[in-house]
Amino acid sequence: TPASTMKTLTAYAAAATLDMGSTLETQTYLEQREDGTSRLVLKGNGDMLLGVGESDSAHINGRAGLGTLAANTAQALRQRGITSVTLVYDDSLFGNDRWPNGIAELDPDHVYYAPTASMAVDGGRNWNGANPTDPDTFSTYPVLSTQPAREAALVFAQRLTERGIAVNSSVEQGAVPDGTSPIATVSSASLNEIMAFMLRHSDNSLAEEFGRLLALHLNAGNSPAGAVQSVEQVLAQRGISTEGLTMVNCSGLAEDSKLTAHTLLDVQQRNLTSGSGSAAAEGLSIVGFVGTAANRLNDADEAGLIRAKTGSLGDVASMTGNVS
């Protein structure tokens, strides 16, 4: 059982295929109805690291802030003479199938996986007021939301109200009207930065999301199964050995996944020798410094020389990476 070292396969496939310099936008759309009411749609495009306040250029987690989006939206609404709206959120990006095989059985308390969503605040983490000082650095696992997009929409509604726009009725799901353009947008950190965050925190939700983004890019099935198929497809196309590979999901949070050390080594070699895998290589935890491998060091002279992806699942402990 590879545990979270499986994430290196997903990371390589995504980095080799997607535009890793691109960002994920969260947007608002306005529909002005014939009865004189205004319907505002909050649409996510995959940013599961939204912040609750102003956009934060200094961090990956919170790079795009719902407070900033609310301020820009409120300004656009007031310019149109609108001071009250009905708010809905569009969470249609990843369809209806959000739970990969193998995860529910291993995560009954919802501390290792938040369902893949078009948007989420801080990956769906609920800190109960004990938020870490640095949003990019933490080592504990709080309970995760099972409805991250809805909770992001509720935060946005609050921020909009604070900026003088009344939100009528409860916040429900809806769709962006055809032919409309966004009135406000905030952008995530780059996919390259998000991948580093995913690998260093061994974030299962983001690992599964990279698989889903890859599947959408390749026009594969919009499902966890489509994500797995897409990763396997890219590995095979790139000549990476998949002999003995059983990939239950994209994160490794599954008891029945299997892969060989040969495949792990193949992936690491490609990361180091091809530009397309650099994001997956550079994002690994740095032993002695950052990520899940920060405290796995016996010799202080080795600090900073080893980049590693750790894996831990029950009695299983695994590791893969590279040495400078």
Task: Pin down the residues of each PLM region.
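Active-site-adjacent loops and short helices of periplasmic peptidoglycan-processing enzymes
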Residues: 1-142, 146, 164-196, 200-206
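Short, solvent-exposed secondary-structure boundary motifs
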Residues: 18-21, 232, 236, 309-314
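Short, mixed-charge aromatic SLiMs
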Residues: 31-45, 222-225, 233-237, 286-298
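Active-site-proximal beta-strand/loop segments in catalytic clefts of secreted hydrolases
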Residues: 43-46, 89-92, 123-124, 172-174, ...
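Short, well-ordered secondary-structure micro-motifs
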Residues: 52-53, 99-100, 209, 221, ...
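A small/polar active-site loop signature that marks catalytic segments
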Residues: 124-278
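C-terminal soluble interaction/assembly domains
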Residues: 243-324
